Amino acid sequence: EYAARIVAQMEGAAVSVRLNTTVLSLSQRRTAELSGPGGYEPVAFRRLILATGCREKTIGSLPVTGTRPAGVFTAGEAQRMINLRHWRPGRKVLVLGSGDLGLIMARRFVLEGCQVLGVVEQKGSCGGMVRNYRSCLLEHRIPLMTRTTVTRLHGEGRLTGVTLRHLD
């Protein structure tokens, strides 16, 4: 609901929003050179907010074999599905990564009615804050599988399972 509210506010605001755009240069004269989907664009501004964002690691960037079936999402994709489209990403969920975002997403999946099979973490301990570990995993009885990784995706067209490997 917060995301939908922000989108609505931005649509009605007297501001210019540039998505998927790189700032090539900024000057003290309040001008910027941008490179975006429409190409090169010089702009002048009174105020400028740079929201640099980030890039998520996709499953394709990890050494995982198997097909690339539907049903594998980044945290950002899952959040968009839930927050903006009100779609549940699946009935059964496995979260890869125990940083704060992974912990919070695991809890959110439970609240959305998903069965969270666990949170998989390559390192030997949880990567998130202790309070998030307690409130997200322990309170919802979600298992944390440390020193573990996903090595294979199963399914033709749709994800049907994964192979996990313990790293010890």
What are these regions (language model features)?
Residues 1, 49-50, 116-121:
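Short beta-strand "acidic-cap" motif of Rossmann-like dinucleotide-binding folds
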Residues 2-92, 167-168:
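FAD-binding core/adjacent interface of flavoenzyme oxidoreductases
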Residues 7-34, 43, 110-168:
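A Rossmann-like FAD-binding core segment of flavoenzymes
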Residues 56, 100-102, 126, 151-152:
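Glycine-rich nucleotide phosphate-binding loop and flanking beta-alpha elements
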Residues 59-61, 104-106, 155-156:
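Short glycine-/acidic-enriched loop or helix-start segments at secondary-structure transitions
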Residues 72, 101-105, 133:
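Short amphipathic alpha-helical patches
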Residues 77-125:
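Rossmann-like NAD(P)H-binding beta-loop-alpha module
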